[in-house]
Amino acid sequence: MAENVQDIKRRIKSVNSTMQITHAMELVASAKLRKSRELAEGRRPYFEAMIESIGRIVEKSGNARNIFMDQREVKKTAYIIITGDKGLAGGYNVNVAKLVEEHITDKENAVLFTVGSRGRDHFRNREYHIQGEYLGISERPNFFNAKEVTAIVMEGFKNGEYDEVYIAYTKFVSTITQHAQMMKLLPLSAEELITSGKVKTTEETKEEKSKMSDRELTIMTYEPEPEELLKYLIPNFVSSTVYGSMIESAASEQGARRTAMESATTNANEMIDGLTLQYNRVRQAAITQEISEIVGGAEALN
């Protein structure tokens, strides 16, 4: 019986140590989540201004085109896949990988660029063609990371190595809700650029636009020519889109990890309560047995 008591005490100690770790990881994830959300909010005005400018140029010029807007027959498809470098984040990594596998209809004609070791390992084990891998940047991405990935992918599209590009990432909704998303990155659609440029603006931007008359917007001219402007703006737009997806994914990963660690901490606490109750019962039973033996021995002497 005494041995059983010691065993329960060891289990309580072990679970308590685990609970301290999961609680610490929960706090760290909360801090990282806050930073990721600040990054996301900081980039939004720049991105909205850029997409509005591109949409306006395409709409007003009428015939302004760019190689990254060319629609062609799809033979090969490239995927930028954003996952984490670590686990312990619930279904965060698995959901993105599953979404990509569902989207790929022809494994032989899919080219992958993986951000994060979890995605890299998943698709490498399934013998997909991984053309590029980017590790150690998933938790704290910066714009230069996004430009590095984007430059290689856009060069491949430009050279005809693949005919369309998708990006798979996780959209951050709230701390407890994240959704795996698949978004077409290239080729860009003129119609979608025009529409996005009109609707993806903040209230502050809308107020500024309202001060300009339709005539002022119509007679606006661009220097240099629209095609030259698009050569500069579109690569930055695509890089900003990739960067935004990285930030969304980083926030989603920390949100998923915080939720998972919070759940683990709660479960560990409940387990400790159960083990403590069990320990008290076993200890009480042992004490009762000892008392009974003493009483029985005393009666035997009498």
From Swiss-Prot:
It is found in: Cell membrane. It comes from the Bacteria. SUPFAM superfamilies: ATP synthase (F1-ATPase), gamma subunit. The keyword Ion transport applies. It is a peripheral membrane protein. GO terms for biological process: proton motive force-driven plasma membrane ATP synthesis. One of its GO terms (cellular component) is proton-transporting ATP synthase complex. Inhibited by nitrate. The keyword Ion transport applies. CDD domains: F1-ATPase_gamma. Produces ATP from ADP in the presence of a proton gradient across the membrane. The gamma chain is believed to be important in regulating ATPase activity and the flow of protons through the CF(0) complex. Belongs to the ATPase gamma chain family. NCBIfam families: ATPsyn_F1gamma (TIGR01146). This is ATP synthase gamma chain, sodium ion specific. It comes from Acetobacterium woodii (strain ATCC 29683 / DSM 1030 / JCM 2381 / KCTC 1655 / WB1).
